[in-house]
Amino acid sequence: VIRTPSNEESETTPSSKCQFDLANVLKKEMEELGICDVTLTDTCFLYGKIPATPGYENAPAIGFIAHMDTVSDYCDHDIKPTITENYDGEALALGQSELVLSPEMFPHLKTLKGRTLITSDGTTILGADDKAGIAEILTMVERMNKENISHGPLCIAFTPDEEPVP
């Protein structure tokens, strides 16, 4: 687990140097996946391109972007995810905390009945914003490579600090 909390007090980009730790790991993974022109800037912006497959060179480029930081307001270490299999559609207690996710407050939960849910235990953040986005983007690239999926030009970027530094 690579911790990447942003620092609201910082006046630099990135607001926390630990975001470079994740960026360096992602850079290597992007290169291993065959992403071209992978670049990590001195302000921790990471980006690369995937050329179009034959016959799709004139298709419009599509960009995928996610940020590497997590919020700093909550505990972001010793994360204890809770996995609820076959969710019953009722209120969902977050671990031993007093926090509850209720379908009344979050109506979308009703559509997830029978699914597997991953939440925090209520004492820490889960860190899925936006590391889940990063995982989805890289998994998409891996799958496109493995399954030889045709596509137009693709651009991928991972940024530091979702919220701008003042």
What does each model-identified segment do?
Residues L46-P54, G114, P153-C155, E162:
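Self-splicing inteins and homing endonuclease
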Residues S15, P160-D161:
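Short beta->alpha junction loops
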Residues Y56-H151, F158:
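Active-site metal-coordination/substrate-binding segment of hydrolases
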Residues E11-A59, G63-I65, D69:
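A non-catalytic alpha/beta surface segment that caps or lines the substrate-entry region
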Residues V1-S16, T119:
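N-terminal capping segment at the start of a domain
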Residues V1-I2, E162-P166:
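Short, intrinsically disordered, charge-balanced linker/junction segments flanking boundaries
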